[in-house]
């Protein structure tokens, strides 16, 4: 079988892993932009936003992809998985309520109120729902070792990235 160190190390190329992280971060940036420009691109009378923060830990992403695909993968191979994860992580709800209001003459008019909600189910909460037992234990091992690649996502560039020592006393919310 695999030697201990090999089975705890991410098997995919840096190009694939950095590419998957960039693709996922790109989807998040698009969502952020959609929300940031919401009022200027929609024409309702009133807006109410209830938005979770957008973001993820790149080590969680790569550990999920590696465990889910049970080994090495290319960016092409995980494109569908990235979409699936994104749809599970972010639930965007847009609801419009129309109220009848009356002007100073007492004439009725419609007032459109838009409620926008973004729910972020942290990426680290998804493995238990999408993986079998074997995949899940692979995921846990990769997270414990950070795939033996603490250099892959430096905190300076990836503020949400796990750090090796910090992981061990990480509390599950």
Indicate where each model-derived feature is located.
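Membrane-proximal envelope biogenesis segments
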Residues: 1-172
């Amino acid at each position: 079988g695999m030697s201990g160190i090999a089975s705890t190390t991410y098997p995919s190329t840096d190009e694939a892993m950095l590419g998957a992280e960039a693709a996922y971060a790109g989807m998040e940036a698009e969502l952020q932009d959609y929300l940031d420009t919401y009022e200027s691109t929609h024409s309702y009378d009133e807006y109410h936003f209830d938005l979770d923060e957008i973001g993820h830990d790149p080590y969680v992403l790569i550990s999920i992809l590696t465990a889910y695909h049970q080994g090495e993968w290319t960016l092409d191979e995980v494109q569908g998985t990235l979409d699936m994860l994104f749809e599970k992580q972010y639930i965007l709800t847009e609801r419009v309520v129309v109220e009848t209001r009356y002007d100073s003459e007492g004439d009725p008019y419609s007032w459109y109120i838009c409620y926008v909600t973004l729910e972020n189910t942290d990426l680290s909460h998804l493995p238990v729902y999408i993986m079998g037992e074997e995949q899940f234990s692979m995921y846990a091992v990769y997270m414990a070792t950070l795939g033996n690649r603490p250099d892959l996502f430096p905190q300076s560039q990836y503020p949400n990235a796990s750090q090796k020592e910090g992981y061990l006393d990480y509390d599950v919310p």
